[in-house]
From Swiss-Prot:
Chain spans, region Necessary and sufficient for RNA binding: 1-72
Intervals of motif LXXLL motif 1: 170-174
The encoding gene: Arglu1
Subunit architecture: Interacts with MED1; the interaction is direct. Interacts with PUF60, U2AF2 and JMJD6; may interact with other proteins involved in RNA processing and splicing.
Lineage, broadest ranks: Eukaryota, Metazoa, Chordata, Craniata, Vertebrata
Annotated protein name in UniProt: Arginine and glutamate-rich protein 1
């Protein structure tokens, strides 16, 4: 019992440490992604600010130039101060330049305040987004931790389902291969049977032709034997006839037998 408990505790510690390492790596990757997003947003914001500043400068410069033109067109050549003295054009130009510089300073300060406010708003927005993202990540981790067993069961179920599907597909593939092999074997057997039948037919035809040739040869041999017998009989008959004639001739020559003719002699008288 003690050994099993120690083994289970070591397994659980190893599992917890591996899960902790996985969580730490996920949090590090998320922090790196956040830092990259923050840097990109800052660079985009700085570009927007520079464009805004350039537009505002050009706008203020154009406005100052237009004001100077209007003042030149509307201002009289000389002015009189409160004491009735004529004010020279030089002093009026100095006042205009001073007023324009003050307006430029005021515009620059206003633009600076606007930029400062935009930067502060952007920082607040980024901090809010960061906190929201951290809160969402924390909630997601908590939810994943709560649903860990359910997720593991779902993963195991999907793995088992995929395994069953793969086993089924493998069995179907093996069955298709077996059927294909059976069909190929059947086709080979059918082809061999057809070849065997063709060979048997050819052999039968050859045997029939050989039998016919042998029968014709036997008939021809019988005919030759019969002709030879007839010739022999004819020879025998001729030989017997020749012998008979020879005997007859011998009998005639030797005078044997009744068949010898009588000789008659007669004398004729002369008148």
């Amino acid at each position: 019992m003690g050994r099993s408990r120690s083994r289970s505790s070591s397994r659980s510690k190893h599992t917890k440490s591996s899960k902790h390492n996985k969580k730490r790596s996920r949090s590090r990757s998320r922090s790196r992604d956040k830092e990259r997003v923050r840097k990109r947003s800052k660079s985009r914001e700085s570009k927007r600010n520079r464009r805004r500043e350039s537009r505002s400068r050009s706008r203020s410069t154009n406005a100052a130039a237009s004001r100077r033109e209007r003042e030149r067109a509307s201002s009289p050549p000389d002015r009189i101060d409160i004491f009735g003295r004529t004010v020279s054009k030089r002093s009026s130009l100095d006042e205009k330049q001073k007023r324009e510089e003050e307006e430029k300073k005021a515009e620059f300060e206003r633009q600076r305040k606007i930029r400062q406010q935009e930067i502060e708003e952007k920082l607040i927005e980024e901090e809010t987004a960061r906190r929201v993202e951290e809160l969402v990540a924390k909630r997601v981790e908590e939810e994943l931790e709560k649903r860990k067993d359910e997720i593991e069961r779902e993963v195991l179920r999907r793995v088992e389902e995929a395994k069953r599907i793969m086993e089924k597909q493998l069995l179907e593939e093996l069955e298709r291969q077996r059927q294909a092999e059976l069909a190929a074997q059947k086709a080979r057997e059918e082809e061999e049977r057809a070849k065997r039948e063709e060979l048997e037919r050819i052999l039968e035809e050859n045997n029939r032709k050989i039998a016919e040739a042998q029968a014709k040869l036997a008939e021809e041999q019988l005919r030759i034997v019969e002709e030879q017998r007839k010739i022999h009989e004819e020879r025998m008959k001729l030989e017997q006839e020749r012998q008979r004639q020879q005997k007859e001739e011998q009998k005639i020559i030797l005078g044997k037998g009744k068949s010898r003719p009588k000789l008659s002699f007669s004398l004729k008288t002369q008148d």
